[in-house]
Amino acid sequence: MFGIISAGLAPGIALLMYFYLKEKYESEPIHMVIRLFILGVLLVFPTMFIQYVLEKEHISEGSFVVSFLTSGFLEEFLKWFLLMVSTFQHIDFDEHYDGIVYGTSLSLGFATLENILYLIGNGVEYAFMRALLPVSSHALFGVIMGFYIGKARFSDSKTKMKWLLCSLFIPALLHGLYDYILLALKNWIYFMLPFMAFLWWFGLRKAKKARSVKTGGQPLQQ
């Protein structure tokens, strides 16, 4: 059991430290990162309950609905809602990159517990593939969500709503595509590899842009 828990924890902690240590100007208080990680862990339980109810009520049927609604939109909406409530007006949210730290912290808390539960049920031999795919993808959805939340935080009132909508719907769409590839496509690996390559490119590009701007600097480009 210790080996399974360690294998489940390791990729999430490693990715979280990677994005946390990339902050260029002023690192976020560690208590904020831990708090958001724990919130992400706790979010797994209501998410699983809602998904269970949707399945039992036959609302969630078919690969498309499961991928884009029950998984993609539901999970990203709940993460987005928690981020907005707990961080958007927080005094420590004073740099664009902070949104990325917050987004990855919460997303990786969610992904880490999900990963541990999967490995307990299916075996530690899946740990490597889980680290490459679901854990990494959750981290990158968090990066993208946090990037656009950061844009909204430091934008004027005319563009704030646009970036808030982007912060929800772009990660939800990408998450839905990820799940649809897994659930609906027969030779999914041939589609998943280029999709993950794109996701890493897109996420790291957003992280680099956010790191380049300090509060009071030039507005971030999309």
Swiss-Prot record:
The lineage of its organism: Bacteria, Bacillati, Bacillota, Bacilli, Bacillales. One of its GO terms (biological process) is proteolysis. NCBIfam families: intramemb_PrsW. Belongs to the protease PrsW family. Residues 24-30, 122-129, 204-222 are cytoplasmic. Pfam families: PrsW-protease. It is a multi-pass membrane protein. Involved in the degradation of specific anti-sigma factors. Responsible for Site-1 cleavage of the RsiW anti-sigma factor. This results, after two other proteolytic steps catalyzed by the RasP and ClpXP proteases, in the release of SigW and the transcription activation of the genes under the control of the sigma-W factor. Keywords: Cell membrane, Hydrolase, Membrane, Protease, Transmembrane, Transmembrane helix. One of its GO terms (cellular component) is plasma membrane. This is Protease PrsW. It is found in: Cell membrane. The chain crosses the membrane at residues 1-23, 31-53, 100-121, 130-151, 181-203. The keyword Hydrolase applies. InterPro entries: Peptidase_PrsW_arch/bac, PrsW. Disulfide bonds: none annotated. Its EC number is 3.4.-.-. One of its GO terms (molecular function) is peptidase activity. Residues 54-99, 152-180 are extracellular.
